[in-house]
Amino acid sequence: MLELETHLSYPFVFEADGQVWMIPESHASGTIDLYRATDFPRGWVHEAVLLDGVVAGDATLLQHGGRWWMFATVRAGGGSYSDTLHLWHAPHFRGPWTPHRHNPVLIDIGSARAAGPIVARDGGLIRPVQDCREGYGAALGLARILRLDEEAYAQRVETRLRPGAAWPGTRLHMLSAAGGFEFIDGSHRARTRLLG
């Protein structure tokens, strides 16, 4: 359990170097922080600040092409948390991180924000994304990464998932897989009752 004074969400958990690591979203801190599990999943210790001076959401790491890649949506000024995708690359997941030369690599409220770990499928990379065109949590998408290198980034959304009749909530947030299972999390938008 990790408790801090700032907002925490989207715990990106991964294994590397024989350890379990986590990068939680904590955009209010202005940093992207790395934690190491001391007693998974209950105990965590702060290991490093990966990036400082950035208001970023849903940082997601991927090892690809001999490098580590960090995907995150960056909020600049009064903009959205969901529409501007930035990339960084590094020789190791601890850094040092170099911003992609074409940041932001994508401006699209329908597919910039991450919705879970990137997975290898059918010889390609699939990136779960949040489709916020109709509001936060309106839908998820599955984007195939077409190009990822130091010169360019490209993706194509191939599938969209919306909350259906069997979904108890009204919003979708994250798609993840572990142990042969796939998980989708979301929330229910509370109805506002007008008093009169």
Question: How does the language model describe each region?
Answer:
Residues 1-196:
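Carbohydrate-active catalytic/glycan-binding domains of CAZyme proteins
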